[in-house]
């Protein structure tokens, strides 16, 4: 599947399975962390929490935990699938119970963006970016800015795209590794920007100049990769079947339609690459929209104490976790990881053909389910009587 050396293939395949098992294990740990520990709302390291967000009274130990509710409020929220937590369900802080430093622990600061982020960026690149910055000190440097890192990884992506277009499988694999380095640098520039703004955890600063610069650089990097994919497939058109070997020595007439046939192959390559590009655009647009919507709905602080408890209730619901997990595997970063894996395994054309139509169906289903959840959650938090009748 991966190359002529069976030993290397077995090692790489084993590493892939171990990585998948690690992702599943971390997802289970993330689910348990969300349900068993308080959700920290203070995302700024130098800002104290408002009283309405910390909890209903200072005598209670759980900061940022789910609020209590009386039996009457449970009955008024009968439109939801489960009842609200009671006052006795105050939850401890995760920071006080984990043995891994929250500086590198991806489960420590749980935010909307962290839950919607793909597994590789959340569990691997984000902690690695933190450790790399702790050693090199980019966030403490006044010379290097996050935007400089963003522009630099565009150059890395261009080099990766050039290698991906190569006829050599070894160079294409090197291009895959370079593009993953670009993804790591993308995590690094976000980490440096958040550290300088004293923001803990993953969070999108929507509307800032850095947000748009980072988006522009990410788009340019994806374009470089897609161009490399197109030129590789154009120069190495996939075979449609086995060549027919003549049984006699008689010379066959030369084919007269070679040029039109090559044009048809190029058009087919272009259609598949354009189809995948459309999926990346659709996934990126929807994913960034839902990060903005959920951040505004679940992490805003200009709400009443009752609404704050309902925000925590929605955040901890299994329905929201399922919606978020769905986007972890269909967002633009996950799609890029899949196409990079197909390039590394020399299965690029098979992947593009398999996802040409099914990818759109999966994305549309994910969008419809997410829109339904958003409408239900917004109505529950801001419009229903369940939140207004919670007994604090």
Curated annotation (Swiss-Prot):
Keyword S-adenosyl-L-methionine found: no
Catalytic activity entry: CDP-ethanolamine + an N-acylsphing-4-enine = an N-acylsphing-4-enine 1-phosphoethanolamine + CMP + H(+); CDP-ethanolamine + an N-acyl-sphingoid base = an N-acyl-sphingoid 1-phosphoethanolamine + CMP + H(+)
Major location category of this protein: membrane
Topological domains annotated Lumenal: 1-10, 162-212, 289-319, 378-392
Molecular functions per Gene Ontology: ceramide phosphoethanolamine synthase activity
Function noted in UniProt: Catalyzes the biosynthesis of ceramide phosphoethanolamine (CPE) through the transfer of a phosphatidyl head group from cytidine 5'-diphosphate (CDP)-ethanolamine on to the primary hydroxyl of ceramide.
Full protein name: Ceramide phosphoethanolamine synthase
Origin species: Drosophila melanogaster
């Amino acid at each position: 599947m991966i190359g002529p050396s069976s030993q290397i293939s077995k090692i790489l395949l084993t590493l892939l399975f171990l990585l998948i098992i690690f992702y599943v294990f971390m997802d289970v740990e993330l689910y348990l962390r969300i349900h068993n520990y308080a959700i920290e709302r203070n995302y700024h390291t130098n800002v104290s929490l408002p009283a309405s967000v910390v909890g209903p009274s200072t005598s209670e130990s759980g900061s940022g935990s789910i609020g209590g509710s009386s039996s009457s409020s449970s009955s008024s929220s009968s439109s939801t699938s489960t009842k609200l937590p009671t006052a006795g369900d105050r939850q401890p802080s995760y920071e006080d119970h984990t043995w891994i430093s929250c500086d590198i622990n991806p489960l420590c600061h749980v935010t909307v963006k962290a839950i919607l982020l793909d597994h590789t960026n959340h569990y691997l690149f984000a902690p690695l970016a933190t450790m790399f910055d702790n050693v090199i000190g980019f966030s403490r440097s006044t010379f290097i800015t996050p935007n400089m890192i963003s522009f630099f990884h565009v150059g890395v992506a261009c080099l990766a795209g050039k290698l991906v277009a190569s006829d050599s499988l070894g160079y294409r694999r090197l291009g895959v590794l370079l593009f993953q380095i670009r993804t790591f640098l993308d995590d690094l520039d976000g980490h440096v920007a958040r550290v300088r703004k004293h923001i803990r955890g993953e969070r999108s600063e929507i509307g800032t100049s850095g947000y748009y610069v980072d988006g522009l650089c990410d788009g340019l990097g994806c374009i470089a990769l897609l161009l490399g994919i197109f030129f590789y497939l154009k120069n190495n058109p996939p075979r449609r079947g086995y060549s027919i070997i003549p049984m006699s020595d008689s010379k066959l007439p030369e084919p007269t339609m070679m040029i039109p046939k090559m044009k048809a192959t190029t058009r087919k390559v272009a259609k598949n690459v354009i189809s995948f590009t459309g999926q990346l655009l659709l996934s990126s647009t929807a994913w960034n929209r839902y990060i903005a919507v959920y951040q505004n709905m679940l992490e805003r602080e200009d709400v009443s104490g009752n609404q704050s408890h309902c925000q925590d209730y929605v955040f901890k619901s299994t329905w929201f976790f399922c919606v978020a997990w769905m986007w972890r595997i269909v967002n633009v970063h996950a799609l890029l990881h899949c196409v990079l894996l197909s390039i590394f395994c020399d299965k690029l054309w098979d992947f593009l053909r398999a996802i040409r139509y099914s990818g759109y169906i999966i994305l549309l289903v994910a969008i419809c389910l997410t829109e339904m959840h958003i409408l239900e959650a917004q109505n529950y938090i801001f419009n229903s009587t369940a939140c207004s009748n919670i007994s604090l």
